[in-house]
């Protein structure tokens, strides 16, 4: 059936308990294994889409939100329709499915708005997966259990699937807490989403002073905070989960849950990626976070007794990302600039250099 969300017409099906056969075939469905909503994104990278879908089929979550923007050209439409067919015909377990299929290309941010309006009207928690994020099978149960355990604990803003170190050997539980994490494969609550989009902090000089003090060792975060306080876009992007999750740490003193063993691998660093370059144009220190090894976790989970941020993990994670490390930061900027020039991306390199060099403008 088609439904209208705001001013946009999209396609949605199998909502509110309605069930229909897949591909015209009636068959006995396997039972779901994990009672958790999952949002997946259809795009134009077949090597990513199929690999992720096979993991989802093994995990068998109870609810799927399938977001699919339209193509920008005939070739993209061909791939998108193939991926839609895969989801339409190969979901072989009992699963409530919400399909958000656009009939044209609306773009990243408009599609996110449409999805969020539907998603958060149906559920109060959700795993968020982009098409290039490959989880371990146990990741789904890991998220489901912690989403329930911490649903009313407002000290926690999200559950991360990624551990930047791969394994945190010193951690004595199956997960720990951090003020720094990753949005690659996160699970959040509606209460987390309800914190998004609030930029009133920019109107209060006192709050801005506090935020400047809190971010004195993170120039990148401070530039974003200043930029979004007065503009909808920064470096060509609207504020999204990456900004708001980080802001939750600085502005709301919230923490993120990080698994002891990494459970997410991003395999989508290519010219089809929205937020990252082709991997050959990334500094070597950043390349390590892509195509990471993933691990399965054993159950029952061993929970930490105390809610304390792991400062050593934060330091190591921030060095990988060149946060709070000016020498590493500038060395990578130079390396990135050189790689872009080498591979014929001079215009893009100059734009990135401008954004890096110009100071943050306070409101």
Residue ranges of each PLM-predicted region?
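Generic extreme N-terminus detector
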Residues: 5-6, 26
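Peripheral/terminal regions associated with large enzymatic or DNA-binding modules
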Residues: 24-129, 133-363
